[in-house]
Curated annotation (Swiss-Prot):
Family named by the database record: Belongs to the SHMT family.
Keywords: Amino-acid biosynthesis, Cytoplasm, One-carbon metabolism, Pyridoxal phosphate, Transferase
The protein's name: Serine hydroxymethyltransferase
InterPro entries for this protein: PyrdxlP-dep_Trfase (IPR015424), PyrdxlP-dep_Trfase_major (IPR015421), PyrdxlP-dep_Trfase_small (IPR015422), Ser_HO-MeTrfase (IPR001085), Ser_HO-MeTrfase-like (IPR049943), Ser_HO-MeTrfase_PLP_BS (IPR019798), SHMT-like_dom (IPR039429)
Major site of localization recorded for this protein: cytoplasm
Binding positions ((6S)-5,6,7,8-tetrahydrofolate): 119-121
Pathway the protein contributes to: One-carbon metabolism; tetrahydrofolate interconversion; Amino-acid biosynthesis; glycine biosynthesis; glycine from L-serine: step 1/1
PANTHER family: SERINE HYDROXYMETHYLTRANSFERASE, SERINE HYDROXYMETHYLTRANSFERASE 1
EC number: 2.1.2.1
Catalytic activity line of the entry: (6R)-5,10-methylene-5,6,7,8-tetrahydrofolate + glycine + H2O = (6S)-5,6,7,8-tetrahydrofolate + L-serine
Organism: Methanocella arvoryzae (strain DSM 22066 / NBRC 105507 / MRE50)
Amino acid sequence: MLNPDVKTIVDAVEGSQDLFRHSLPMIASENVTSPMVRKVLSSDLGHRYAEGQVGHRFYQGCGFVDVIEGKAIELAKEIFRAPHVNVQPVSGVNCNIAAFFALADPGDKLMALAVPSGGHISHAKFSAAGIRGLKIYTHPYDNQIMNIDVDRMIKQIREIRPRVVMFGASLFLFPHPVKEAREVCDEVGASIVYDGAHVLGLIAGGQFQDPLREGADVVTGSTHKTFPGPQGGIILCKEKFAKDIDEAVFPGTVSNAHLHHKAGLAITLAEMKAFGKQYAAQIVKNSQALGAAMDDLGFNVLCKDLGYTKSHQIAVDVSKIGGGSVLASKLERANIITNKNLFPWDDVNTTDNPSGLRLGTQELTRLGMNEPEMKEVAKFIKRVAIDKEEPEKVKKDVVHFKSQYQAVKYCFDGDGAYEFSLR
């Protein structure tokens, strides 16, 4: 018989497992790992430390860890064609903090997207950029194309002369103008950091854009969104920044790198080497198919004239049918898991119920769904959002539909997306 406190926790863990077994997971910042990755996450590595770099550790007993981290670095260099790789950060925000410490000093200027325009919180004064003491200026943004205004950006870089120009976003429909910024950044002495957290798997699979080839000096990213690995971070950079990046990671911002996650990352890198091109291509196809299907059903999907998206995300303005928070809550009752999202025209004080829904297809794709399934998903959302059906009624059909998608695809051992037991 379980201890009552332990039982409370075990019940909640199993409840969450069961929820997602029967739900449509459409949070754009999540994914599901392969069974092999889940196995190594529960290995003895989760008990161990390995401070330092491969071959230069401060503790004994790290020989196998060196093999694992060395293989992860080798695979990442190959997949991303990166001169230098650091796999030790424990999150995407950790990566950004390390990049800011490596490339800038307190009081230096940073250009990044505003949060309502899709910028991540770590690019703002109340998170990583503020921790480094950077003065933050926001990219000029074109609401019509949901992207940075290139001409105004170039002008602003010349005027402000920032130390770091940041690209990347949490609402990220289209590639950012890295190539267009490179020349003017060289002119003013600015480094380019590309936060690829959301699109790292797309980049690995040859989709979306190739920031290192387009002119980025440093690419940061989390490893658990379109890149379907365990939660963690990775930094890719040009060789000239390698020493500063490595020192900003250790001893700067990481002590122990969560070794079980690095083993999972290495396996996911092997999966992406084998299956990444097909996976990334299907994600983009599914996103565009979902956007078209929802548009056909009467939703206000942004950027129709641009094909809705080139990433794993679509953005839907639901301000006239309840707002993002209200609708996300209703969809959750139907086992459709989404999130509300600020849009550029929203007041920052409307975070409780902003205009938008952000929908991601990367996890549905990982579970084997293709374009025809996106039409079915769109119909489920319409029944709740537009037809005003009781969510609990729609839930029954969602559960039946999801029962057909219970295995992880684009990996070596795809059975059992939700196999799990604590009792």
